[in-house]
Amino acid sequence: MIKERVIIVGSGISGCTAALRLMQDYDVTIITKGYKEESNSMLAQGGVAAAVSKNDTPKKHFSDTFQAGCFHNKVLAVNQLVTHGPMVIQKLIAEGMAFDEQDGELALGLEGAHQLPRILHTGGDQTGKFLTTFLQEKLTDIHWQEQKMAIEIIKQNDSAIGVHCLDKENRLHTYYGEHIILASGGLGQLFPVTTNAATISGDGLALAYRAGAKLTDMEFIQFHPTLLFLNGRCHGLISEAVRGEGAKLIRADGSAIMTDVHPRADLAPRDIVAATLFAEIQDGNEVFLDITAIPNFEKRFPGITANLDAHHIPFRETKRIPVHPGAHFLMGGIRTDLSGKTNIPGLYAIGEVANAGVHGANRLASNSLLETLVFGEKVAEYIRTQKINPIDHPEIPLSNQIQTPHLPDKQLLQEKIWETLGITRKPEKITEFLHWLTDFDYANHTRKTAEISHMLITAKLIAESALKRTESLGAHRILKGVIK
C-alpha cells in the first residue's frame, strides 16, 4: 500500500514533533534550509512552560498568557495550549525525555509575567538543544533533505501539493505531498540584532503569502530584553531565567532600572522590559544584568557561562553582563485553526511561523516551546483523520523568473527594518519605508536572491500591519499612541 506523503519545511521542535507522530503510517520528508541542527529550537534556553506543579493549574497559566498577550489572544487557542501542555509533557517524559529535577521533583524555573515557577528545563539552560536532539534521534523512519531552501509552494486546483527548493549550488529540487506543513520559524534575521539562527529570515511567511495564505498580527514582534552585547554587536541570548533566578537590570552606576516601571520589576512582560531598556540606551546609558544574587550561576546556566567565557566577559569578577534588546519572536504569522490548517487546502503551519492566536500582542516567556509541542501533536492528529489517495503529479515548473532582479543590499535592508519596525515605530517612517520597498523586485532563482526577496515580502507585511494599528498594543509601539 502506498503511503500518503507529508512534506515538512523546518527541522525544529514543531516539525519534528509532527514527524514523530506521523512517521509510522506516512511517508514523511523534512526539508531544512541548513543542517537539521540549525534552528531556533536548538538555541532556546529558558525551557517549556506548563502547569505541572501541585500549586499550579491550567487556569493560572491561561490567565498569565492572556495578561502577557494584552488580551489580544484567542480564548480557544490559549485553552488548548495550557490544557494539553501538561499531557504533552507527561507523554515526552514517558518516552524518555529527561527534564532537570531537584529533590526527586521536576525543577521548575520562574520567568517574566508568570505568577509562579512553571518552566521545565534540561541541561540547565540548554532545553531547546536537548529537546530537539531527543526528538530528532527518534525520527528513524523519515527522509531528511538538508541544505534545501524552500522557495515556492506548488499549487494545483487551489490546493498545496508540493514545494520547490534550491540546494547550495542553486539546483532546483521538487517534493510533492498530500500534506505540506510549514514549520520554518520566524523572521529574526530581518533585524541586525537578533537571537535567531542565521537561517531564520521569514521564508515560510513569504512562501505562504505568495501561495495565497492569510497572515495576521504581523505587527507583533517580540524583542527580547537581554542579548549579550559587546563592542556594538550582539552575541547570543541571555535567558529570562537568569532574571527569574534573581538577576537585576542596572545602569553603569548600579542603579536599578525596572523597580519603578512595573509591579513585577525585572520580571515584567518582555515588551515592557525591552522598551524600557531601549529608552535607556537611547538616552546614552549602558545596561547590565547584575547576577550577584545567583551564587550558583555557572552550574545553573552552563550554556550561557560558556558563551560569556568565549567572549571574555569578566562576569565572575564584575557580576555584570552587558545586554541589549534584540528581535526574538513573531507573535503573528500564517493564520491557522487549532489543528494548524490554513485557508489553503493541503497546507498547514505550526510553531512560530503560524498564528493560531496563542500569544496575542506579546508572548509569555517559554510558551513558544510549549506551542511547538502542542500544535505539532495537533496537526498530526488532524492529518490522521484525512484519507487522500497519493497520485503522481505532472512536473510543475517554477513560476516566471525576473532575470535581472533589482534587490537591496541585505545589511542595508536589515538596518532600515530596525529603524522603521524596531522596538518603537513612527507612522511617517513606516510610510516612507513602504514607498522605498516599491523600488525592488521579487526573485528566487538563487538562494541569495530568494532570501532577500523573502525578507522584502515579510517586511512589507509587517509594515502594512503596523500602519493599520494606529495605537500601541503589547509589542507594537507607535510613538504617537498610548501604550496599553
Swiss-Prot record:
Keywords: Cytoplasm, FAD, Flavoprotein, Nucleotide-binding, Oxidoreductase, Pyridine nucleotide biosynthesis. Signal peptide: none annotated. The active site is at R270 (proton donor/acceptor). GO terms for biological process: 'de novo' NAD biosynthetic process from L-aspartate. InterPro entries: FAD-dep_OxRdtase_2_FAD-bd, FAD/NAD-bd_sf, Fum_R/Succ_DH_flav-like_C_sf, Fum_Rdtase/Succ_DH_flav-like_C, NadB, Succ_DH/fumarate_Rdtase_cat_sf. This is L-aspartate oxidase. Its cofactor is FAD. It catalyses: L-aspartate + O2 = iminosuccinate + H2O2. Belongs to the FAD-dependent oxidoreductase 2 family. NadB subfamily. The keyword Oxidoreductase applies. The record marks E111 as: Important in orienting the L-aspartate substrate. Pathway: Cofactor biosynthesis; NAD(+) biosynthesis; iminoaspartate from L-aspartate (oxidase route): step 1/1. Its EC number is 1.4.3.16. FAD binds at residues 11-14, 33, 40-47, 203, 352, 368-369. One of its GO terms (molecular function) is steroid dehydrogenase activity, acting on the CH-CH group of donors. Its main location: cytoplasm. It is found in: Cytoplasm. Catalyzes the oxidation of L-aspartate to iminoaspartate, the first step in the de novo biosynthesis of NAD(+). GO terms for cellular component: cytoplasm. The gene is nadB. PANTHER family: L-ASPARTATE OXIDASE, L-ASPARTATE OXIDASE, CHLOROPLASTIC. Binds 1 FAD per subunit. Coiled coil: none annotated. It comes from Listeria monocytogenes serovar 1/2a (strain ATCC BAA-679 / EGD-e).
